[in-house]
Amino acid sequence: MDLDEKAVAMAKRNGNINRQRIDFVHADAFVYARQMVRNGRLFDAVLLDPPKFIVGRDGYEEGIKKYHDLNMLGLQCVRPGGLFVTCSCSGLLSPAEFEHTIIKAAQRQGRKLQIMAMTGPGWDHPFLSTYPEGRYLKVLWAIAL
């Protein structure tokens, strides 16, 4: 599921080339997740990789709320024992604050997370020591209990 039509079309082409049966959906994540919750759909794995929600310091609180809300919805869609992976590419959001936001979202859903790892950019995505915001990619890997 992606809001970008071109990304969905490319994914469909790749799936067809590799002869994989995958359902690709062009939709807004918030709308689609709410629909899945209403329909009682649960998945073995949920991966959330939204666009940058915190664009500037003025939008920090609004961005945190979006991360919180999207992760609450995502957690409602993953079955107990399922894989839950969530990402942030907001440079102004620290890894600690990102993790705190995800844990808070899980608690509001009455869920616990068994956090397996908190990762970030790979070696092919370097950042300057004098510009910590360049280390903007954060990925939390967990089992949703």
Cite the ranges covered by each PLM segment.
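The conserved SAM/SAH-binding core of class I Rossmann-like methyltransferase domains
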Residues: M1
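S-adenosyl-L-methionine
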Residues: D4-L47
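Flexible loop/turn segments at secondary-structure boundaries
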Residues: A7-V8, Y32-A33, I54-G56, L92-P95, ...
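Short amphipathic alpha-helical segments
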Residues: K12, V37-R38, V55-E61, F98-E99
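Mobile active-site "lid"/loop adjacent to the S-adenosyl-L-methionine
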Residues: H26, F43-L73
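A structural alpha-helix within SAM-dependent methyltransferase catalytic domains
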Residues: V37, H68-L75, I103
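C-terminal catalytic and target-recognition region of SAM-dependent MTase-like enzymes
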Residues: L42, D69, L83-L145
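Helix-to-beta-strand junctions that scaffold the AdoMet/dcAdoMet cofactor pocket
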Residues: V78-P80
